[in-house]
A protein has these predicted regions:
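Short aromatic-rich membrane-water interface segments that cap or initiate transmembrane helices
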Residues: 43-46, 78-79, 137-155
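Juxtamembrane helix-capping/reentrant segments at transmembrane boundaries
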Residues: 34-46
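Alpha-helical transmembrane segments
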Residues: 1-30, 54-94, 126, 133-136, ...
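Proline-centered turn/helix-capping motifs that create local helix->coil transitions or kinks
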Residues: 119-131
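Hydrophobic alpha-helical hairpins/lids featuring a short glycine-rich hinge
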Residues: 80-121
Length: 338
């Protein structure tokens, strides 16, 4: 537990201290969101704040995991999976920063995220199995005792990359109101940290450290991003947070062999996922491009009803908390029944 607190505190402290420098650098280099019809900011806003989030997260993980490495004689600390998460996060930090400056086309954004997912797979982070309500009809290896379907390599890679893509894009999509994405990600990461700490696996404590570092980085960034925001996280922040949350859920929440295992990570990340599904559905019905930016997201619709930014943020925080509490309850059911 001490290590988890240290990871969160270090990440929060580093992120909070670095953000003002990142803000000045973003303004100087031109990484700024200009006011326009689909945005809510009324003045230019520095948008590369994710640099601070990434640095806070990275420094906290390196320090705490290395500390645990020496305390545990290297057992289940600096594993290939942990290295894969950091490498994939670093790749998306670079790609996200490029997008914050150059506004990459949708196909290049998709390619960057897919490559990050493949990096995770190459380092052993993948969805190995899921609960299967259809029994053994999907092929592969099926265990009827726990209703667990072990995926083929091809299916495993596909679902892993798809999950990483969905989570990363959905986190990016909710970054539209001051403090929203950082707060929701902090709530989700805290839930995943609690789950990881209860896993009866050697890597559970290390996963908890990584999740705690995300919590700390988000809270440290909120010091500057909560309304009225002085800086936004930009693509770099949203992509790093989405990637790490997706990876932690794969290594933790998906491991529960029970009828609820697929629901757990979906509920933990329910706010961005359900919002994104709703928006995509409305775009399809309107025959609008799926990648087109618009004001169909929940936070936009609440603002249009006359809510202020703080009301919107705290309402969505509350929804996220309810979903995460539900996920924790289902996780306990799955863990005890396994």
């Amino acid at each position: 537990m001490t290590g988890i607190l240290v990871a969160a505190i270090v990440a929060a402290f580093v992120t909070m201290l670095v953000t003002p420098s990142v803000r000045r650098w973003s303004e100087k280099m031109g990484a700024v969101d200009q006011p326009e019809a689909r945005r809510i900011n009324t003045a230019p806003m520095p948008r590369a704040g994710g640099i601070a989030i990434f640095l806070g997260f990275l420094i906290a993980v390196v320090l705490t995991v290395t500390g645990r490495h020496f305390a545990r004689s290297g057992q289940h600390t600096w594993t290939m999976q942990v290295l894969g998460v950091l490498l994939a996060a670093t790749w998306l930090a670079i790609a996200g920063l490029v997008d914050d400056f150059k506004n990459l086309a949708a196909r290049w954004q998709a390619l960057a995220i897919i490559l990050a997912g493949l990096i995770l797979v190459a380092f052993g982070v993948r969805i190995e199995g899921i609960t299967n309500p259809l029994g053994s009809t999907l092929g592969g290896k099926y265990d009827p005792l726990v209703n667990w379907h072990t995926l083929s390599i091809g299916a495993s890679i596909f679902l892993t990359v798809l999950w990483v893509f969905i989570v990363t894009k959905t986190v990016d999509a909710i970054d539209g109101v001051d403090g929203l994405a950082a707060g929701v990600c902090a709530i989700s990461a805290a839930t995943l940290a609690l789950m990881a700490a209860q896993l009866h696996t050697p890597e559970g404590p290390t996963l908890a450290l990584i999740a705690a570092a995300i919590v700390g980085a988000c809270l440290g960034f909120l010091r500057h991003n909560y309304h009225p925001a002085k800086i936004i996280m930009g693509t770099i922040g949203a992509w790093v947070l989405g990637l790490v949350l997706a990876a932690i859920s794969i290594m933790g929440a998906f491991k529960v062999a029970a009828a609820v295992s697929v629901l757990v990570p979906v509920l933990v990340l329910g706010v961005p996922i359900f919002d994104y599904i709703h928006v995509l559905t409305r775009r399809l019905l309107a025959r609008a491009p799926l990648t087109a930016a618009d004001k169909r997201h929940l936070h936009h619709r609440l603002l249009a009803r006359g809510w202020n930014q703080k009301q919107v943020v705290w309402f969505i925080y509350s929804v996220a908390i309810v979903l995460c509490i539900t996920a924790l309850a289902l996780f306990q059911v799955g863990r005890l029944s396994h």
